[in-house]
């Protein structure tokens, strides 16, 4: 596929993403070489927590949880979701080359979430999708 830097992840608790609750196994392709290792939330200064409250019921529930996670005043579940988002967005930031380490990627994702920029982008995306729905009708 031509990718130059990729992280394939699978958590010990069965998620196909980086887990807030357990160790995550990683196969990282970088500079033509694959390295396998594991990571935990504590390695990036995030406290490991259960996934209780993060199970999504439907798209409306998902949107509400994301708004809570990205908002200025977060509930306890919103805090947990924000950490889960930072863990996974941090990987994307790292493999995109914006940072030189996964830990730096998570820190940048955390700053973007807590600085309000992530919620601003979500609002822009939400408004854009509303305009698309007008064309479907």
What spans do the regions from the language model cover?
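Glycine-rich anion-binding loops and their surrounding alpha/beta cores
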Residues: 1-137
